[in-house]
Amino acid sequence: MNVFGIGLPELIVILVVALLIFGPKKLPEIGRSLGKTKRAFEEASREFQDEIKRQTAALEEEQQAKAEAESPREISP
């Protein structure tokens, strides 16, 4: 088992140290807080990416419209 590049023995050591530092009553609360923080970070990241995509699309449309306006149109005789 390899989670985030951390093997099972390392993960067990980390959990034991966390248990010793925070105690069994605080660990669920800390886990919830970390989960909420991770979720909020992912949401903010997703919103940022969506905004970048919207801005890029708007710029591309603007450039395309400008190019179409500047290009000479052929007139049929």
UniProtKB/Swiss-Prot annotation:
Residues 56-77 are annotated as: Disordered. Residues 63-77 have a biased composition (Basic and acidic residues). It is a single-pass membrane protein. Keywords: Cell inner membrane, Cell membrane, Membrane, Protein transport, Translocation, Transmembrane, Transmembrane helix, Transport. InterPro entries: TatA/B/E (IPR003369), TatA/E (IPR006312). Its main location: membrane. Pfam families: TatA_B_E. The chain crosses the membrane at residues 3-23. GO terms for cellular component: TAT protein transport complex. One of its GO terms (biological process) is protein transport by the Tat complex. It is found in: Cell inner membrane. The keyword Isomerase does not apply. One of its GO terms (molecular function) is protein transmembrane transporter activity. Forms a complex with TatC. Part of the twin-arginine translocation (Tat) system that transports large folded proteins containing a characteristic twin-arginine motif in their signal peptide across membranes. TatA could form the protein-conducting channel of the Tat system. NCBIfam families: PRK14857.1 (NF011429), PRK14861.1 (NF011430), tatAE (TIGR01411). Belongs to the TatA/E family. This is Sec-independent protein translocase protein TatA. It comes from Thermosynechococcus vestitus (strain NIES-2133 / IAM M-273 / BP-1). The gene is tatA.
